[in-house]
Amino acid sequence: MSGDTGTPNQGGTRYGSISSPPSPGPQQAPPGGTYLSEKIPIPDTESGAFSLRKLWAFTGPGFLMSIAFLDPGNIESDLQAGAVAGFKLLWVLLWATVLGLLCQRLAARLGVVTGKDLGEVCHLYYPKVPRTLLWLTIELAIVGSDMQEVIGTAIAFSLLSAGRIPLWGGVLITIVDTFFFLFLDNYGLRKLEAFFGFLITIMALTFGYEYVVARPAQGALLQGLFLPSCPGCGQPELLQAVGIVGAIIMPHNIYLHSSLVKSREVDRSRRADIREANMYFLIEATIALSVSFFINLFVMAVFGQAFYKQTNQAAFNICANSSLHDYATIFPRDNLTVAVDIYQGGVILGCLFGPAALYIWAVGLLAAGQSSTMTGTYAGQFVMEGFLKLRWSRFARVLLTRSCAIPPTVLLAVFRDLQDLSGLNDLLNVLQSLLLPFAVLPILTFTSMPALMQEFANGLVSKIITSSIMVLVCAVNLYFVISYVPSLPHPAYFSLVALLAAAYLGLTTYLVWTCLITQGATRLAHSSHQRFLYGLPGEDQEEGRTSG
């Protein structure tokens, strides 16, 4: 490795190079192409100087990644947290976003340094059984996220049509509208990224409008944001806190971001180019997640102001005395605390601030659902290609994901009601939190490997912070499961939970084990773990691809 940061490595070796031989059989581009079929060139500027031109060239992946922080699951989590705890959990939102940024920084760094995404690196380093289980957990997270997008979009259509489109009809519409967005690929990568930026702008304007008209108490808001406490909180507030973490730090998003950064032309044989790319991607991700944080803050603050400690009777009276009096019947006439969801949330905003607030809310919700649909499709495609080396078109990938997400959502929409859809949304947020270790542990493992990342491996401070995130998430998840299990409706469910818990703990234990090896606990390693210490030698790469 050359000591001159402006020159390539000796022999032109690429940093983190783990390129493996092509898979057996004929190789061809995936049908319909992929996001990565086009590379964005980076302009040459003065070495070492910050350049807005370069920042603009690197801008795109971070904003696409940030959409997962703004999907309907996040919106549901925000308003539920506001309604249940007022402003008390704003600090959880703030720190979850900061921790999310740290995880996304590691994902981007892995993609830049190695030239491979997290799924591809998992395929190379993990044995067959753990990587197959890992792939299944991430696919489960993607399907869960897609169900939230379907629910959010269906509710948006129902609100915009004043109830003329039933929920099950809105669910079916999502089958059609998804394919419309697949055609956007034909217009080029930068135009696609600009379109996502447009959808984020719509969300910022619509939810920002709701914040302005609701006028939350700024003193209480700032106290909830910067004082990490929750006086008088119990299990409902804990569930919302877990939901916030699961909605903000989504497992599949870490895999997605590590692949999106590969769309920029970075010379990985030059140390300075890699360092520069890492810097610009971090700046872009920070800007993008700052925008997403304020959008989530707008929603949580609005409902913390409008819904906290409100009763169903109070909500009924507000709507009955407004121009949207026909909606009043969705609130029972009792003195129980109102259980708000994204449908009732739009209605009560309309009752409080006029019909415009309802329709603006629905437009923002629609933008959240549609933008998340496309990024979820990309994540699914990248994960499948990385773990299984299967190249599908996005059309086929959307069919697979929606085939899993649509049927249960339609059944709930037809035979149950909004309460059940809202409850499903809450459980899906908790599911994301439970699956989070299967993204954070691998990214922490591989970005801590000097053999893979060389000088860009995690330092001591980064290891401590990221490991603390992992311990915190696992502790909160464990507390939630222990609290939730006694409430199971039938003893037969205990056997199923025990079986799932055994598989969950087994995979988590293996991932923690390999992670500790890369953190310096070399005594835990045996012969099958040598790759985590010394990387994949060139002559063993094919073995690394095929051996179990």
Swiss-Prot record:
Polar residues bias: start-end ranges: 1-12
Annotated TM spans: 56-73, 83-102, 140-160, 165-184, 194-214, 238-256, 285-304, 347-366, 398-415, 427-447, 464-485, 494-513
Source organism of this protein record: Ovis aries (Sheep)
Cytoplasmic side: 1-55, 103-139, 185-193, 257-284, 367-397, 448-463, 514-548
Name by which UniProt lists this protein: Natural resistance-associated macrophage protein 1
GO BP of this protein: iron ion transport; manganese ion transport
Annotated region described as Disordered, given as residue ranges: 1-38
Membrane topology listed for this record: Multi-pass membrane protein
Location of this chain's protein in the cell: Late endosome membrane; Lysosome membrane
